Amino acid sequence: MPELPTDRLTAVIPPEETLLGYLLRLSRPRFWLYLGGPVIVGVSYAADGPGELFSPLAIALFLYFTIPGNVFLYGVNDIFDADIDEHNPKKDDGREVSYRGDSAVTAIVVASGALALLFALVLPTLGIVALLAWMALSVEYSAPPLRFKTTPFLDSISNGLYILPGVIGYAAIEGVAPPATAVVGAWLWAMGMHTFSAIPDIEPDREAGIQTTATFLGESNTYYYCVMCWLMAAFVFNFTHWVFGVLLLVYPGLVFGILGVGVDIDEAYWWYPAINTVVGMVFTLIALWVMLYG
């Protein structure tokens, strides 16, 4: 499992027994850039120069979606999955913390979500719509009455929430939506990424009586579903720029590599934050090159 800079935080942050240490671990440091990264990409493509790239609003959005946004997203998930997580090996092996039923934690999770509403004071209308959509999907993915995560295919579709911070970041700078092909392509990518990450949870979810896209399709067919999502994402991104379409082909290629070499999916899953960080960095570097050199 590759080490990310965020992985080193566990050695320096307060112990899990403290409230701050627990909250930081609940926010999944290894996955911080899953929300914060799209902000960087969105802002990079919207900005006309370094001034906009490092504007106070852009920085505030990145900081929010890196930590408080993750506390909100994963906090809601852990609160409503407390019983199910008893069967989750990710909790048993210490890679993720288990919800401890602390009222202070619940209050902070709610406050982390409410904090996002402050951006409504400065975002354009489209940015506000995207922000509200992100908040709604973050809650209803895990919480009743919709609880998308327990409905095959809706769990996958709803995980487009991960790309909405990028839409918000783009709208915050440009005032309009990013290209539709970029949004649809990124949404399809997120669908594949979410479902791929659910493969290690197939047996625990079945034991807990949870229906997901992965439990419904089974492991073999889930690989094909992910490949389909990523091939479609590459195809759609091609209409934004062919380079983006080519870049996205790394994902179906990795699936065939995993199957061909026989890599344990439980191990491969933990490589993807690093892979996604590298791909996101390439997207960002392309934007910066265009910004600086045309």
Curated annotation (Swiss-Prot):
It is a multi-pass membrane protein. CDD domains: PT_UbiA_4. The gene is lyeJ. Disruption phenotype: Mutant produces lycopene, but not C(45) and C(50) carotenoids. Its EC number is 2.5.1.150. Its main location: membrane. Belongs to the UbiA prenyltransferase family. Keywords: Carotenoid biosynthesis, Cell membrane, Membrane, Transferase, Transmembrane, Transmembrane helix. InterPro entries: Prenyltransferase_related, UbiA_prenyltransferase, UbiA_sf. It is found in: Cell membrane. This is Lycopene elongase/hydratase. It is an enzyme of class 2 (transferase).
